[in-house]
Amino acid sequence: MRFVIQRVNHAKCTIDGNITGSIEKGLCVLIGVAESDTKEIADKMIKKLVNMRIFADENDKTNLSINDVDGRLILISQFTLYANCKKGNRPSFVEAGSPDMANELYEYCISECEKAVSGVQRGVFGADMKIELENDGPFTIVLDSDKL
């Protein structure tokens, strides 16, 4: 499983001009699911995400978590995080989870994040989404379950 975590001042997801999720200060998280991922792996990733200290404290040191700053989450599914570009110029996505399995784990991530953080917003799995955000920093972290 891969999360691309971006600290944002605000972010929103729209589909066909309709806003499906919008947050102010918080994290925009792109979620990629591999075929080998499980709920146990998702639990480890979510625990790391929720407890990651990437917001500045009063001394401007990254020492505060999303809950410490009353921040929000917007979770966006993105199978392209598992693009393999080793051969040729067209990415392969064979390492990405099948749509049914990936959607199940994406929904699980949303459900578990809602238990841990107030103000969780979302995109729509498999939809053609437009993501608009303002990075804060920028501060971006790629979290890969293979490296936890």
Describe the role of every protein-language-model region.
Residues 9, 73, 78-81:
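Short glycine-enriched loops at secondary-structure junctions
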Residues 45, 76, 139:
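Residue-level signal for inorganic ion chemistry
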Residues 94-96, 136-148:
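Short, low-complexity, polybasic intrinsically disordered segments
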